[in-house]
């Protein structure tokens, strides 16, 4: 079983619960589909956990909040911008380096892992209607 974790956004409790559930279900592959940070109170802790899993063979993908947290330009709403500004001050150098190193996409066997669009992994389109939601099915960042 593959455990797909997306949009944790610095939420320690959510990450802990998701990882515990994946372990209970005996996941043999872990994929973090982006947005490890942003909004939540524990961006460093969440990033450290992802780093531990990646060191053991997990995949981690860059999300738009991760990119913004390490200074890559991306237009965000004022609330997200404030959260990212706060997050930047909480991340240590090694955590920032890890986030900076994350790829936009990883292809593995018959799967493509991305945070947003498989057609344009470097663009993060917001899901604003049912049509876009349909196109975004089974990827992170969709928040559907």
Task: Please give the residue ranges for each predicted region.
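Active-site neighborhood of divalent metal-dependent phosphoester bond hydrolases
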Residues: 46-114, 119-140
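N-terminal active-site segment of His-dependent metallophosphoesterases
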Residues: 1-56, 142
């Amino acid at each position: 079983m593959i455990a797909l974790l997306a949009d944790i956004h610095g939420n320690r409790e959510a990450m802990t619960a998701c990882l515990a559930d994946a372990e209970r279900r005996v996941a043999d592959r872990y994929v973090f589909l982006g947005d490890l940070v942003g909004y939540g109170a524990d961006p460093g802790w969440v990033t450290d956990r992802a780093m531990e899993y990646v060191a053991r063979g997990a995949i981690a993908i860059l999300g738009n909040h991760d990119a913004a947290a390490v200074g890559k330009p991306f237009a965000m709403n004022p609330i997200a911008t404030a959260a990212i500004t706060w997050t930047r001050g909480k991340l240590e150098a090694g955590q920032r380096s890890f986030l900076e190193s994350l790829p936009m996409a990883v292809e593995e066997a018959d799967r493509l892992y991305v945070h947003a669009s498989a057609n344009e992994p470097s663009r993060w389109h917001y899901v604003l209607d049912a049509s876009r939601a349909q196109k975004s099915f089974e990827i992170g960042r969709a928040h559907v």
